[in-house]
């Protein structure tokens, strides 16, 4: 069943992403040559109105190929009126941005469903560890965390991710007690038992039942949490604070999906669906953020070229841009192979 869940989740995320590109391309009059879900050999497909609609073997990617994009599939001479390069620069930008945007929209819709069924978690402290910084600062159970290092806190899970990523650095914490706001500076203390630095909050989170318009508010908080967690994790990778073992590819993600499904299945189909929907929400945000990185072959890399064009008033030759993106694509494939190899080694270790 793990493979089925993996295919369904990745298929939905990729479909949302590529449909975003497809829809805005149609709105902007750009001809879509191929709309594909998956990578590798073609399984099934059909041709309609000049577009090939294809499902490919590997459910880990997709493509929405525009006519003339990168100068690779357009005949020599002037671009046709419906080609990608013939469209105004802002039309092209919107068509590229739409992919990640639709991932965020999918994540928000899933978050609405999740919050509507299971509510959310208010950042209330449930316990204080004796002898740790929070205890020494006078914090008490029932205090509501409102900010950490000047970042607004809305969910209990944000407390964990912020303390975990903060490490041993001093942390400014703002909290509310009986309507009064307090601020304190906590210096994390190393815990031999947990193997990391702690500020001494022992459990946090108070269930909140979302009703009416508050469902949309808490759904936004859920997507915001996933978005910021992804950004912070990427920042750790860039700074060298995370190792290769902290990075997972498709194999590692499939393993997580399988473990979550195994734990949730005994509680019934609704609990299983909610857990898988939560994973899909996280992955959809993750894909949206990653695609906006300014790297060749990614949507963010294409946006860089188009923004340069918008500023300088003329495009970079499509053939040259195409070579840059092709090189970036090859590099990404090499990276994917490395990550998948690392996943497999961990799986059988």
PLM regions: where:
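Alpha-helical transmembrane segments of multi-pass membrane proteins
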Residues: 10-14, 65, 103, 107, ...
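Terminal peptide-recognition signature
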Residues: 17, 55, 134, 142-145, ...
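Membrane-embedded helix-turn/re-entrant segments that form the catalytic/gating core
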Residues: 26-107, 207-215, 310, 315
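Functional transmembrane alpha-helices
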Residues: 82-83, 87-90, 188-287, 304-327, ...
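Low-complexity, small/polar and acidic-rich linker and loop segments
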Residues: 114-131
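Conserved PDZ fold ligand-binding element
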Residues: 134-156
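PDZ-domain C-terminal substructure recognizer with occasional recognition of PDZ-binding tails
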Residues: 140, 146-147, 161-203
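Final/C-terminal transmembrane alpha-helix of multipass membrane proteins
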Residues: 323-343
